[in-house]
Amino acid sequence: MDEGRLGLLGILFEFIDEGRKLWMVGDGENKYQFIYAKDLANACIKALDYNKTAVFNIGSDDVKSFNEVYKYVINNTGSKSRLVHMPKGFMTLGMKICYMLGISPLGPYQYKMISANFVFDTTKIKQELGFEPTLKNEEMLLKAYNYYHQNKESIKHRKNVSAHKSVASMGIIKLIKIFS
């Protein structure tokens, strides 16, 4: 993740920017480990001098729950957004149906990612390559949100850019936005 990372995050950022409710899948206590783009690049440079073949897990440290990460961004931006928790089974089924009908940008990866834990042990890369992440999840998300907030008008008019450099189409999420 970096300052210009948008895609589906652009939808989240729009909700935060407008002070809307953030609909959470389940209790929001699940964790997902991000990696800051500059940290990933730094790790790749360090790996160039590594004279062995190995597999490394890479990611941020001190991974907090989605509740904590989102509240950090909300609190540090002055947003009026608040978290609303919905039953995991109900939300996941709804996301699957909407995806199958072609009316949602959220696919199988997203419904797994936002409802389960994805945190990996990064001890090996730290010990063998001397890698240390520089940003935590909440700091990365805040940087990305701030970029969105400062550039939202130009972002709306972008053409021919990658999916991660523009805001994803909301589809059925537009209806959810009305109730937010």
Where do the model's predicted regions map?
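Short linear loop/turn motifs
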Residues: 137-146
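Short, surface-exposed alpha-helical segments at coil->helix boundaries
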Residues: 6-10, 67, 119
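Conserved C-lobe helical segment of Hanks-type protein kinase catalytic domains
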Residues: 15, 43-46
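Glycine-rich Rossmann NAD(P)(H)-binding loop
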Residues: 1-2, 24-30, 56-64, 74-77, ...
